Amino acid sequence: MKVARSKWTILIANILVPISILVFSSGFFPYKTLLTGFATHEHTIGGQIPPGVFDKVLLLQADFHASDFVYSQHSGFLFTQRLGGGFLIRSGAALPFTAYASAPTVTMPRLKAITTGSVPSFLDVILNIAEADTSSTLMHQDTWLAQLKAKGGKLVMYGDDTWLKLFPGMFHRADGTTSFFVSDFTEVDNNVTRHIPNELLQDDWSAFIMHYLGLDHIGHKAGPNSPYMITKQHEMDSVVSMVYTALEQEKHLKTTLFVLCGDHGMNEAGNHGGSSVGETSPALLFISPKFQRLETRNDSPTEEFSDLQYYHTVEQTDITPTLAGLLGLPIPLNSLGVFIPELLAMWDHGAKSIPLTSSSGPHRIHMLLENAKQLLGAVKGSFPSYSFEFDLMPVICSSQSLIDIERVQCAWFRVLETLNGSGANHDSEASSEIESALLLFLRNAQKLMSSAASDYDLIRLYVGLSISGFAISLTFFPAKRLLVNFAPAGMFLGFSILSYSTMMFASSYVEEEQQFWYWISMGWVVYLHVKYAGHFHGNSIQKSGPANGHWPFEPSLPWFGAAALAVSYRVLRRWNQTGQKFAAQPDITGSFFPSHQHTLWALLSLAASDSPELLGNSFLQPVAMLTDGMHLLYHARMVLCGISLLMIYSLYAGKARETTHKGRGKWPPSTIFHETLTLFLLMQSKVTNIPAFLVFRVQITILASMRLSTVEQTITSLLMQYVTFYAFGGSNAISSVDISNAYNGIGTYSVFIVGALTFISNWAAPIWWVSASRLLRSSQNREEKEAHVTILTLHMATILMSVMAACTTLRTHLFIWTVFSPKYLYTIAWAMINHIVVNVLGEIDWRLFMKR
């Protein structure tokens, strides 16, 4: 009865884990409250509408367009830097900026920032992968595209189909390409370029959007320093040349604004999503022959900056009000952007007409006034209890210590005071004073609104915490009884759980979590060495007990096996440098393999693919002849089908063997299943990570030669899952998510399949260790297997609650969206998929099909 009760207790605890996640997430990631409707010019002070300088916009959006790609001396954008005998930027035809892109630096949130001017929700990180999702649409939100559409303009778009998902039915002509086939460097861009010559001849569009993906795909597959990168930069530069030439030659394009920008950058590993300098510093250029009259002169190319802040740095959200103003459109209601001051010169600074309080006046002043009133409306909507009446100014602004909202109030009062004091005085000095006051207010308001805490649902946060706490209480006492029987190992596990839980409240430790697992695993090796130094033996694994004949090795290991285990851990630690502090340090995959490629390919030699002539008259020759000339997609599908058949066979054979009570052979079904799974995981891993599976083999062979207890086997499995995840380049940053293998064998997009393959490719090493540890535990009885699940559940529930508690306590922390929120998303993946699906449900599947 006690065993049955314990079983139901653990089942309930594992059900409570996803429930707690759903409840907590609904309070932690609420949809933002936005102002409804669309902006109009009716709200402009004095009724003055600043005239548009341009009537068309051509946006060239280059995914992963870091600032140094355009501005540095090593850039491939030669035409962008050089125009004839001079320089495009130096001539003033292009105004260069670095546009700061706040985290999360993935495409969908950044496109929302560029088109609405607002700071996107962190939940868009998930929606960025779910391409079929429609909840992220901007169809009913105020954007500069919607304003153009309302004005009667036609929009065309070619490239990343994220635009089609954000703006369904808005484009007059469009041809979208999925952004996740990252192995494609050429077709995704050629599909855009082929439309350009014809579209440049058309005069019916008001906005022409081109979104190129090639740079981003090269970065994901080979990193930002790939030799393919400079070639792709030359290709993008040729597109700039084509467009700019058309602006000069085509009459209907004389009043067209050309904007070249990136949605995000990329880190040294070739990924993005986080907040490193490389990820948050894309380039931004406003290009038009009209800008030459401003007589702006900038050096180009320029010296390199380690922080990538070339020229003047603006916020990416500033693009929205700037485009709206230059095109003569109302600024979208929810925009937090500030009109870029350098472009105000497109209106006459010295215009002298009549007082600013009347219906006319310097257009640049009215542009900033419109921007200020729009942003003031957003501030009032978020802080309804604060008044912006001028009469309150002496009371509030006399204080020496002001909070952010009070600084915004005082800045607005300063604007009103300056406007009222100017009266009929409309000379250049008065205009400059008003501009300064307006820009001060705009920057303060932008800072306030961009950093304002989300509207958390605290009740749901606390309920989610309580549910996870209840899951811990359900598993604590069953696990305690198990751990007490194995005191040293139990104390070690308890210490690691408490240490980890405490560590989650420090942002630096969260960023460098891999260090915790590396050190704790080395401590575990020391423990195993002290306990089992005298128990290494030369017998086969079958005689030692744990593997029970299910492991295909019969090692003869001496007493120094623990030392070899420690060395292997050290190798894994340097396999991929991850985290933030040491990410740029030399490692095996980034430093050794690139300079010793013969070593890598010796480990990965695939004669059938690279040298089919070496097959000779072997039995594989017919296979090579059959697949000769076949599309690579079908190659991948054939391999996946073969792997699937082997897995099905191993499961069926295991069930049949249990039914017929046949004896065990050298290759029992459980081993076949594991080896087949290994083949699949190799397919889903980066090429440079594949040799690490050999290190895993060495480790599991050593561990199989020890007489580990039930608890020790569980702790070993748990530690290895986390250690190898970070050894393969994982971290707590969104930018470490690898999508380079998310489309293996897939011809069309499927959110479920792509999501599953993305998880498998990033958790390939932990999945391997879950399977390998089952072979290690194959001699365990039912109670021992349930004890294994109990300990894992206690560990996962405690980790989940500690991360939830940290996110709740530190919800107003500066790094809540760059450190703690990504950590929470990773914890969801660890709990929902790795723990429940791979560990718990996988254990049930193993017991159903494999003979114990």
From Swiss-Prot:
Bilayer topology term: Multi-pass membrane protein
Residues carrying sugar: 191, 420, 576
Pfam families: Phosphodiest, PIGO_PIGG
CDD domains: GPI_EPT_2
Annotated protein name in UniProt: GPI ethanolamine phosphate transferase 2
MF annotations from Gene Ontology: CP2 mannose-ethanolamine phosphotransferase activity
Function (record text): Ethanolamine phosphate transferase involved in glycosylphosphatidylinositol-anchor biosynthesis. Transfers ethanolamine phosphate to the GPI second mannose.
Transmembrane segments: 458-478, 486-506, 516-536, 632-652, 676-696, 714-734, 750-770, 787-807, 824-844
